[in-house]
From Swiss-Prot:
The lineage of its organism: Eukaryota, Metazoa, Ecdysozoa, Arthropoda, Hexapoda. This is Chorion class CB protein M5H4. Residues 143-174 are annotated as: Right arm. Belongs to the chorion protein family. This protein is one of many from the eggshell of the silk moth. Residues 72-142 are annotated as: Central domain. The keyword Repeat applies.
Amino acid sequence: MTTIVVLICASALFVQLAFSQCLGRDPVIGFGGAYGSGWGGYDAISPYDGLGYGVPYSAGFIGLSPSNLAASCGGALAVNSLSPTTPTGLTVASENTIEGNLGIFGQLPFLGAVATDGAFSTGGIGAVLYGCGDGAIGIVSEAPIVAPASIGYGQWPVNAGYKGIGPCGCGGLY
């Protein structure tokens, strides 16, 4: 029985190690004393501000800052492959007959080669232009993520934004 419990706990630990990502935290703004004034950690025992997970002088976002949510920030997710065979890649194929001028552009998820196969008319030309950009490998199409504006924690008695603490949120501007 002990072996089964240890095996289940070890499996849960390995799953958490494989699928977890640290997004960090930003400071709580507005309080004095142990909570600081928005320039440090949000508790008295931890001055952690998540360097690399948000600006030290945060713009008032409690929790995750927008820079934490982009796929290109916050460190890399490690990918390990222990397959006995090499991946063969990704194939994008079209069985259509295409006549006239054709321009195809887009993003493929891995570095690789481009090949054309099929019958080309002798009166036209066929060319493949291939470039590997800035080294970003993957299906990446990002736009800036804008978080809702936050009033933040104010002074007592209003305390949590312009509406105070109540059933309708804490007064963020959505």
